[in-house]
Amino acid sequence: MGFDHRMETDQPPVVTATLLVPLQNGSCVEAAEALLPHGLMELHEEHSWMSNRTDLQYELNPGEVATASIFFGALWLFSIFGNSLVCLVIHRSRRTQSTTNYFVVSMACADLLISVASTPFVVLQFTTGRWTLGSAMCKVVRYFQYLTPGVQIYVLLSICIDRFYTIVYPLSFKVSREKAKRMIAASWILDAAFVTPVFFFYGSNWDSHCNYFLPPSWEGTAYTVIHFLVGFVIPSVLIILFYQKVIKYIWRIGTDGRTLRRTMNIVPRTKVKTVKMFLLLNLVFLFSWLPFHVAQLWHPHEQDYRKSSLVFTAVTWVSFSSSASKPTLYSIYNANFRRGMKETFCMSSMKCYRSNAYTITTSSRMAKRNYVGISEIPPVSRTITKDSIYDSFDREAREKKLAWPINSNPPNTFV
């Protein structure tokens, strides 16, 4: 009767405090659960789960935190420096801006965006063991973490389409500069709209934690599957199919036309090297971001803070490694990019050597002032009057001129 009387009076805090006292004793848990109403039981379960969450935030070893910080710091430096260098080198190539340059700059900007707007905050959460920037910032960080891979994979698909028509059907369709710009803009705008549900799924009820994974509800599961198919599986399959056709075409030309077309340049070697570079770039990107999507499909429950934190940090590090690997691949497989880096780091007091179509020996003071100097070989005495006519068709005679190229028009970076 006393219990019923207290329930009828408007004193819920007294009831809550009275009924939560037996919960401190393990032998009285069943009796307390029988007395607690359904709403108060849910309140107690949520309170105990959040308390366990707070306790588990301090279970990370200092060695784990230090190791993750070192690896993330190294990748962050490589990504910031490398992708900034890519943008700078291509910006200096003002003579002929190819469509490939636009795609490469777009991917470099996406890598810089995730390096600035997402990765530092993930490392901060891992090292401090809690989220101290609020729920709104949590949504923004997770949004950029979903935005950048979707943009990059569709830009890679655009590069694949460009390479396919450039090599297999060079006369039927051409990706011009305007088409490349529209393809890049469509990749950014459509993917930015596609990942907007992240703002509704992420965030938490308290300010000390930012959810790592999408919620295991049917809405979260449905969006995870749709995002995995549209943002990863479908473009990956299209990329594989296009490159398969390109490789088959190059292989067929190399085998069937070896005897009949030995002197004909059907597929330029530079384009074949570019295809190899982007093929390797696609493989690195797909294998780097696959663990992230698998972890999201797995939907691990975040009641074990240590496990979820380690899993999320590992898959984030693997996915972020693709941002640092792109400039490395450019410098290894593209001689023009290496030449552009040398020209970028070359100071006015240094001597720059270019392995270009020009024959360059040393950079004189006249060349440093962006003047073009031409020195001709003195003509040899002719005994036959027809030699002057033949010289106009003689390649060696026309190439006996030495010229310094103008620094304001450096060569194209990606061919």
From Swiss-Prot:
Domain of life: Eukaryota
Residue ranges, Cytoplasmic side: 91-102, 174-182, 243-277, 333-415
Membrane topology: Multi-pass membrane protein
Ranges that cross the membrane: 70-90, 103-123, 153-173, 183-203, 222-242, 278-298, 310-332
InterPro entries: GPCR_Rhodpsn, GPCR_Rhodpsn_7TM, GPR19_7tmA
Extracellular compartment spans: 1-69, 124-152, 204-221, 299-309
Assigned GO CC terms: cilium; neuron projection; plasma membrane
Listed GO biological process terms: G protein-coupled receptor signaling pathway
Tissues and organs where the protein is expressed, per its UniProt entry: Abundant expression in the brain.
Keyword terms: Cell membrane, Disulfide bond, G-protein coupled receptor, Glycoprotein, Membrane, Receptor, Transducer, Transmembrane, Transmembrane helix
Residue pairs linked by disulfide bridges in the UniProt entry: 138-210
Compartments (UniProt record): Cell membrane
Residues bearing carbohydrate: 25, 52
GO molecular function ontology, one term from the record: G protein-coupled receptor activity
Functional note: G-protein coupled receptor that plays a role in the regulation of circadian rhythms and energy metabolism. Participates in maintaining proper circadian gene expression in the suprachiasmatic nucleus (SCN), the locus of the master circadian clock in the brain. May function as a coordinator of aging-associated metabolic dysfunction, stress response, DNA integrity management, and eventual senescence. Upon binding to adropin, modulates mitochondrial energy metabolism via the p44/42-PDK4 signaling pathway, influencing pyruvate dehydrogenase activity.
Family, similarity comment: Belongs to the G-protein coupled receptor 1 family.
The protein's name: Probable G-protein coupled receptor 19
The species this protein was found in: Rattus norvegicus
